[in-house]
Amino acid sequence: MPHIDIKCFPRELDEQQKAALAADITDVIIRHLNSKDSSISIALQQIQPESWQAIWDAEIAPQMEALIKKPGYSMNA
């Protein structure tokens, strides 16, 4: 708490880049939510482009009103 779940198209990130990403995100969460470092968890899931529709349908579209940053694209047919 909080838990951040990042889903993105595949990227070539080495362990150092992943650690830097996690550190930057952690800093933002600490600053804005007044969380402790030890309470933050972050997942990075790389999703193939052809599978993104399932993410949209299950996680993005149903939560559109709750998103604090909405996507600048739509996958509605």
UniProtKB/Swiss-Prot annotation:
It comes from the Bacteria. The active site is at P2. GO terms for cellular component: cytoplasm. Its main location: cytoplasm. GO terms for molecular function: intramolecular oxidoreductase activity, interconverting keto- and enol-groups; protein homodimerization activity. Its EC number is 5.3.2.-. Inhibited by (E)-2-fluoro-p-hydroxycinnamate. It is found in: Cytoplasm. Keywords: Cytoplasm, Isomerase. Signal peptide: none annotated. NCBIfam families: PRK01271.1. This is Tautomerase PptA. It comes from Escherichia coli (strain K12).
